Amino acid sequence: MAKKSTPVDSGRSKGKKASAPRGGGPAVIATNRKARHDYHILDTYECGVVLVGTEVKALREGKASLVDAYATIDAGEVWLRGLHIPEYSRGNFWNHTPRRVRKLLLHRREIDSLTGKVRDGNHTLVPLQLYFVDGRLKCELALARGKQDYDKRQDIKRRTEEREVVRELGRKIKGMKG
């Protein structure tokens, strides 16, 4: 009977890579948590992002920031501005510019629909998250309307009340068991 061979460790360092998880789902690179706090999300779109080689490598290292990012529509094309992808750590002289404007890929009918809604006013395009699907970077783009301060306070109050209800139910259920 032949012996089963065991895998040998190559000795390479196992750095943090943003590849797809074992389940085959998307590997999330960056999320814009503040967007859901500052905006009412009306609709979301999945769009592709045009990148250069060193940007892809930097994103695979899990580096990106959506903090000040937003999208604009110019001449029938959607552009992502303010996205920060730091330079690739092992890049050379030809490394990319960290805050360059990147083109987003959407269907024509989606762009036309967004153009009409954004032009009417009070709406903006905000990226919610960046993730890889089948090796391609996707951006979840949201059509959003800005919240006023009183809206934010109402949301905080509502979440606090929901937490209190859950806490009380937990206490009552725990008391019934004892």
UniProtKB/Swiss-Prot annotation:
One of its GO terms (molecular function) is RNA binding. Disulfide bonds: none annotated. Its main location: cytoplasm. GO terms for cellular component: cytosol. It comes from the Bacteria. SUPFAM superfamilies: Small protein B (SmpB). Keywords: Cytoplasm, RNA-binding. PROSITE patterns: SSRP (PS01317). One of its GO terms (biological process) is trans-translation. It is found in: Cytoplasm. CDD domains: SmpB (cd09294). InterPro entries: SmpB, SsrA-bd_prot, SsrA-bd_prot_CS. Residues 1-28 are annotated as: Disordered. Belongs to the SmpB family. Required for rescue of stalled ribosomes mediated by trans-translation. Binds to transfer-messenger RNA (tmRNA), required for stable association of tmRNA with ribosomes. tmRNA and SmpB together mimic tRNA shape, replacing the anticodon stem-loop with SmpB. tmRNA is encoded by the ssrA gene; the 2 termini fold to resemble tRNA(Ala) and it encodes a 'tag peptide', a short internal open reading frame. During trans-translation Ala-aminoacylated tmRNA acts like a tRNA, entering the A-site of stalled ribosomes, displacing the stalled mRNA. HAMAP family: SmpB. This is SsrA-binding protein. The gene is smpB.
